[in-house]
Structures are given as structure tokens and as C-alpha cells.
From Swiss-Prot:
InterPro entries: ExoRNase_PH_dom1, ExoRNase_PH_dom2, ExoRNase_PH_dom2_sf, KH_dom, KH_dom_type_1, KH_dom_type_1_sf, NA-bd_OB-fold, PNPase. Involved in mRNA degradation. Catalyzes the phosphorolysis of single-stranded polyribonucleotides processively in the 3'- to 5'-direction. Mg(2+) binds at D483, D489. It is an enzyme of class 2 (transferase). Residues 550-609 form the KH domain. It comes from Geotalea daltonii (strain DSM 22248 / JCM 15807 / FRC-32) (Geobacter daltonii). Belongs to the polyribonucleotide nucleotidyltransferase family. SMART domains: KH (SM00322), S1 (SM00316). This is Polyribonucleotide nucleotidyltransferase. Its cofactor is Mg(2+).
Amino acid sequence: METKVQVECGGRTITIETGKMAKQASGAVVVSSGDTRVLVTAVATKTAKEGQDFFPLTVNYQEKAYAGGKIPGGFFKREARPSDNETLTCRLIDRPIRPLFPDNFLNDTQIMATVISADKDNDPGILSMVGASAALMVSDIPFQGPIAGVKVGRIDGRFVANPGFEEMEKSDIEIVVAASKDAIIMVEGSAAEVSEEDMLEAIFFGHAAIQGLLAAQVELAEKAGVAKREVLPPVVNEALKAKVKELAYSRMKEAVRIKSKVERHNTIDTITGEVLTALAEEFEGAAKEIKGFLGDFEYDLVREHIIKDGERIDGRDTKTIRQITTEVGLLPRAHGSALFTRGETQALVVATLGTSIDEQRIDSLFGESKKRFLLHYNFPPFSVGETSFRLAPGRREIGHGMLAERALARVVPKHESFPYTIRIVSDILESNGSSSMASVCGGSMSMMDAGIPIKAPVAGIAMGLIKEGDDFAILSDILGDEDHLGDMDFKVAGTSTGVTALQMDIKIGGVTREIMGVALKQAHEGRLHILSKMAETIGTSKAELSTFAPRITTIYVKTDKIRDVIGSGGKNIRGITEATGVTIDIDDTGKINIASTDKAACDMAIKMIRDLTAEAEEGKLYMGLVKKVMEFGAFVEIFPGTDGLVHISELDTERVKNVTDVLKEGDKVLVKCIGIDKQGKIKLSRKEALGASLPE
């Protein structure tokens, strides 16, 4: 049966319908706004795989080329591997729904969001977030929703829900908020150095904006009338649990307080191995259960110690930042480099400057665009003492890189004043929590080391949460284990003035305004501390670019001279680049950027362009080259491609019988421009230039 609900959100009508498409899926909806349509399906297997001990949730998001009236490029002419934007949207859909499945539901579950129509004003990613929740709500899959997502902007001081793409260009805040009826579940986005108080207002403005979407999903689920599957609670072997506790609890209590990550993990591994050996005969085949009980003990012990005693795994209190060491300029040939170390997390971050040729071309549903600021985050397995087979960057690396990129993009100079392409690469060398925020700190320092005139230094910090009943503790600069055992990972980046990026994920049902307010305030204090540590090494951008970075010189020519610079089939511009080795970029306005690490080569290229575009001026002297001799005079080239006529009467003060008596082809001759007619023909005189010389 086809069922449909409609709701207003941010002045836009959003429609959710089910029962028309993909009816064999466990749940399927089409979410639409304007001309944008997204089909979202949810399917879960009937039973879990034998021995399954984690929840296998997969989320896929794909933008069909036909949705924008396009045919895919490439040889095969079909959609291929996901773009970075599609990967990031997968993460946006995944993160808010993942905490809302029952703990003992371990069936393979797949969410597929397919963009089947797209306009340029309604974000299909936001509709997909709503659709994922709605598809689960109308299915028999157990799900503790609904949730909904909304994009929040602030334009001219006014918060706006789901602004269009053009509107967002005027906004100083761009965040995505996902929430349930009573609590925030996920936040992600960027801002132009906005205060923590304003960010909090934006988040809860978004929470208020989605209430109608939540109610609409409940109504849709009631109309669909599909009963949820029953999820039985896990059967606990109490005898085994008691035995494991007897053998390991006191030792685990000591182990979780070992400050070194490697030593702590090794000790826990040793305890695990000894318990497995001791119980192997009595409880044969129970290794997985035993490891589960030990993990539960570790979880409870760490959290209890933090809540009751205010002391964390490594001995810090809740607000202390780990020791920070920094260094810049450590790679001699790189344009800018920084080594940022915070505790057992270390990032080598390198900044490289390029030209417009190095810009990333992005082909999307809405046309082609160019990207001139890039940040690539790499997380090699050795950073955590592991081995793995590495291919392309995974979803996590792409997501962490984009978070760091957003944090730094707000302080990068505008292209008009700094016409460079900038690429930041962050290689994580060690990791024990907060590696993406180490990338932000190192990226800021590497740009300053490269001489890029950033608006202000940026630092980032990861905040955690331990919540037991009504008691909670906010943790500054969390460890990897605190992320794993805690309830929240809240990353905040910004300058001393305000926030430039944030990202929050939780593992519980949601967080309140009070918790978020405390976390943002504590993050601000931590960020200022980190910025002060960074400033001890470098606090402002170097006055000069690296000697190995290209220098870009900008000149302007008249628009009708652009073709003269390019030449037939690109002959002229190709000749300049081959002769000088420079890189040249010309736009339609006549703006020309010339890039080279060699100043002399750049100067030569400028002269060649000036010669190609120069115009003769009456009364001015020129050193010309005789190109052709005729009976009535000689044609003399005064600029490349620009000739003028020296009439026989203008060759000398005396009467000249034959032109060849004075000039021959290939001669260099000093001439003076004595006129330009209406057709642009240039009249030259050798006679007027006799006795004169070119100014130096």
C-alpha cells in the first residue's frame, strides 16, 4: 500500500513515501524536496551469522548520473567507485543511526541511498539521512529511532534550516545536525571563527527544526503497520562470568591504570591469555565469551575510576592536555613542514604550493568545479603497531582528512590575494587518540612554515564523555582507549577567536544541551593551551615563501589581446613556456598568472608577453627588425607579430633612390612611430630616429 507524509522544514516541503518502489526490501522510502528525489532502502538478513560478535551495518550512498541529466565519463560510461563526497555522505548517514540498534541485534544490515533526481537547491545527502531513518522505521528491523538530519546555516545573523547551495556561500556557519526527539546524536561542519555560544545555538536551532520530520516518520511507520522483529537479550553464563571475575578482576583493575598504551595493552593481553588457559578445560569453546567478560570488566573499571575518582587511564585529570612537542622546517626541500606530537599521537604534516594547473577538478551532479585547497590524511598501520594491506584511502581516512581540511580552510587566504593551490598531507606516525586534530595543528604550523599568510593559527582537540546515570565527566584530549570505552567523540577545532570546525559522534541515545555546553567550554580552554604551545615554535606565517616554492606574478592584458598571447593553436604561449620553463594561466578577464621558482625566467616570460601585447605609441622609439623590403619602403617588426611601414621617404634625411641602399631584410633598425591610421596601420620613420637612442 502506498503511503505518503509531508512536512515543512526550513520553508521547504519534504515528502516521504513508501510502498511504491523497492517493495521487496525490508523497508524502502522515497524522500523528495523540490526536484530532488532519493530512494533509500533498508534490508537485514533473517538471522545473524554463526559466531557473529559485532553489528555488521553497511551504508552505501550513490549519486546516479542520470539524476542530473548526465552520462558518466570514462571508457565504460557507468558509475564507478564512490567519489569523496559520496563517501562522506555515507558516513553522515551511518553515524547517527548506528547507536540506535539493539545491542544484541547482530544481523547483516544494509542501507542503500540512491539519488535518482537532483536539482541545484536541495541537498540529497540531508534527504538521505532522513530516508535512512524512515526506511528503518517502516521496516521490521529493530531500530530505536526515528532520527532526522538538517543542515544549518547563518546568513546575516539569522539561522536558516536547509539553506540552498547558493545561500550557503553567504553563511558563516555550515553544520549538519542529526538528532532524536530529545537529544543530539551527531554534529559535523565548519564555521568562520564563530563563538562556542553561537555554535551551541546553531545546533539546537537545528534540533528544533527537525521535530516535524521526526513526527512525520512516526506517522508513516504507523500507517505502514509493520511489526518489529523480536530481539532476545543475550544469554549470560553466570558461572563462567563469576569464574572469570575471580581470576582476573583485581588484575584488570591494576592493568587499566598503566599509563603506557603499549604496556597496558600487553598486560591485558597477558591476563587474557592466562585466563583462557586456566579455563580452557572446564569451559571448552568459551573463548569468545571469556574475552567478552574481560572487555566488560575493562569498560566498567575505566569508567568507574573516571566518574568516582576523576582520574583517567594515564593518570591525568579530566581537563589536562598531554605533553606537546612541536618542530617546523624539518624537511629541507618541502615548502613547509611540521612535526606535531601530543602524548603518543604524532603527525608529520607537509604543505606544498602549486599553481592553477594543480587544482583538483571535481565532476558532480551539479557540474564541474575546482578545488584549490586540499588536505590528505594518511593512517598507516605502523602508527598503531599493526600490519595491513593498504590500497586506496578508506572511509575513515577520507572523513578525518575532510574534517581537518574544513578546520583549516576558513583561515586560508582568498585566491584573489594568494593565487596558489595548496595541498596539505598529514602522515600519522603514531596514534593514541585525536590524530585528526593533530593533523589540524600540524597543518596550521606547516602552512606558517611555508609562508602562507593564514588568517590565524588553528588548533584542534578531541573531547570525550563518560556518562553513568545522571553523573557525567567531560574529558579533554582523549586517548584511543577513552574513545573506545567512552560515550562520545567530540572534535573541536578553531583559532583563539572562535570555532572553525567540529564533529561529534556518540554511542549512547543522545546528549543534552548541558553536556554539549560543558564540552564546548572545556574544548575552548584546551584549544587555547594548545595554541600557546604551538606559538612557542611558530606563531605567525613566515614573511617569505620557501625558496623551493613557485613564485606567482600576476599581470593583466586587454581581453582582445588574450588571443595574441595564446597564438594560433596555442603556438605563442607554448613557445613562452618552452623557452622559459614557467607555468602560465590565463583567464577570460585578461588576468595572467606566471609561476616559476626562477625569477629570471619569470621576468623573461613577462617581457615576452608584454612584447606580444604591446601597442605602438605615436612619438615613441622602437628597435625593430626588417621583415620585408618593397620598392616603396620596408616593413619593420617592432613587436612580435606587429609590423609597421617605413616609407622610402622616411628612410633618411637625404633622398633615397632604392630602399635596399639603406635597409635589407634581417637588419635591426631604430625607428620612431609617427602615426597610426584608423585601420590600426602603423607608420614608422627611420629618418626621425636618426641621432636618437633608446632609453635604458
